[in-house]
């Protein structure tokens, strides 16, 4: 039924873009963060093309730097603990992440129906299942989507090489 060799005992599933549509939530959070930043600067608003060209799939700070550079704007780097209102690269990235978390919890995150069915079929077949992601917000997404195993016999670990999205 699953189309897997009989020797397979576990499956890894990527959270972002395979199980869930987090890209649309990221896109909205980036647009809000950048539009708030650009407001009053005489710059056009953040577009879908800007998302594709400058931030999609990049570590958060790289996305901020690349987008601002496309508009001829530079900010100091700042510190990882900069507040969301800090006029720094990392502050703007933190603002975006705060907006993302608000959207995750208020609007939810769409789960792809076919992926949910496959994940459930893997469970029913007795296969171990692991969800992987480079996102710092993995636990939040798993919680709001209901993809956390029940009962929760799992451990969430977050050790990305660098901060993403």
Predicted features along the sequence, with ranges:
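Generic leucine side-chain signal with a strong bias for well-ordered alpha-helical environments
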Residues: 12-15, 19, 119, 142, ...
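Catalytic-core regions built around general acid/base machinery
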Residues: 114-125
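N-terminal helical cap/lid subdomain that shapes the substrate entry/recognition surface
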Residues: 5-15, 19-112
């Amino acid at each position: 039924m699953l189309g897997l060799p009989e020797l397979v005992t576990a499956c890894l599933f990527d959270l972002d873009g395979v199980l869930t549509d987090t890209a649309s939530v990221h896109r909205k959070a980036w647009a809000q963060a950048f539009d708030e930043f650009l407001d009053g600067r005489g710059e056009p608003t953040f577009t879908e093309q800007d998302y594709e060209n400058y931030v999609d799939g990049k570590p958060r700070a790289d996305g901020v730097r690349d987008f601002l550079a496309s508009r001829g704007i530079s900010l100091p780097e700042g510190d990882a603990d900069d507040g969301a209102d800090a006029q720094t690269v990392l502050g703007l990235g933190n603002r975006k992440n705060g907006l993302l978390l608000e959207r995750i919890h208020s609007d939810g995150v769409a789960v792809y129906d076919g992926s949910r069915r496959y994940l459930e079929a893997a469970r029913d077949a007795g296969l171990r299942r692991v969800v992987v992601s480079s996102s710092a917000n993995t636990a939040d997404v798993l919680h709001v989507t209901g993809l956390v195993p029940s009962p929760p016999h799992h451990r969430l670990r977050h050790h990305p090489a660098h901060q993403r999205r």
